[in-house]
Amino acid sequence: MKMKKLLACVLSAGILFSLAACGGNGNGGLSELPTYEQDKEFLIGGWDVPPDTEEAFRIASEMGLTFMFMNATFAGYGTDRYREMIATAGEQGVKSMLMFGNGQNQPQNAYEWAAAYKDDPNVIGVNYWDEPSVPTLDSTIKEFAKWHNAQFAGTDKSFYVNLYPTYVSSDVLKGSYDEYLETYAEIVAGAETGTSWISVDYYPLKLAASGSTVDTGWLGNLEMLAKVRKDSDIDTFHSFLLSTQHMDYREIEEEDLRYQAWVNMAYGVNAMTYFTYRKSLNESFSTALVDMQGNPTDKYYDAQQVNKELHAMENVYLSFDWEGVYTVTGSQNEYVDANGVSDYFRRLQYSLNSLEGVKSVEATQDTLIGQFRDAEGNKGFVVANFADPYYGKESADTVTIHFEHANRAIICHGTDVKTYEVTDNTLTLNLQAGEGAFVVPVWLNR
């Protein structure tokens, strides 16, 4: 177990942010900067396991993965080799989410082998189903939830199901999406072991005549799950990141991985998985993060850098609870409605009308600002450049935030966590394509 330490942010100069001293009378301010315990870990997973060797899982761990969905590509479910694979991964610092496939037409006792992992410290939970329909949720998944509570009673093993995205047809879903989420929330409310999860895979970066487009339904899906997560007090909001080109999704670069991470975090996501980690057995899938032997590709190093950034900020970001998202239409965006609202934002249902402690925000590109609060009541903001990173320098975003009262800002950006002085309650962030920052404004008494 990590020793609990306190993360203290020191004053530092920087070139990405506007800096200077700001006068203040100190009324209602803090006597010292907020500090955050170093006892948290961002859950970063991989889909499609590498070969079950020490070397392969060492490579996964060094990329920054903390867990993997352990399928049966190299070791059959319930076999001694599967158990050895989980132990080998654990020795390298990679936990396991057990996999049942979809368990179609199979009774719960077909999975009694999983109960043997009840006390295994290398297992974080069990994945029972990928994309169930409403009837499947209302029957099979409810039965699995009861079985899980009984088999894993008194343990930290989580119950996990990955949900359909909003674009699935009603013929497939067999019900409305609102009904779908409501049914799932009822199931999760009855979970008695581990942490509660809500998960979705929505891959937003698509091929287009211009080279790339961002799916217009992505944010709507994220906000729906974020609302259910908040209303139902679900612990873990998990999302898959597109890392392998397939179907009508485009090739992915480092900026695209970072972009997906920051947009997801604007909606409070606190666990992410790369789809896929290893080269898929499906030959239509492009290069993944590692090849079939588990050897790194160029994309591996892209993901490794993004993971370093996520882990650098985890103790700050994970100390906050999500409250909502405020959208800012970029001044350079020409695709707006009659009210000047971005095409990506105008159909959102639950966006905030304002940010607490913020007078106004301007941005050159479409920008998402997720609002958060820590245990002491301090506000935190994920500021995510929403412009498609495919277009490089054209997608650079300058964001200016006018706070009501702030003379310092703790800023997580890249692998840095630093505190900056703020001029006249105003902070300017220069975000490159795909970038974001986590900002904690502070009114510090002098």
Please report, for each region that a protein language model flagged, where it lies by residue.
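N-terminal secretory signal peptides that target proteins for export/translocation
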Residues: 1-2
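Sec-dependent N-terminal signal peptides
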Residues: 5-14
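Glycan-processing catalytic domains of CAZymes
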Residues: 26-407, 412-446
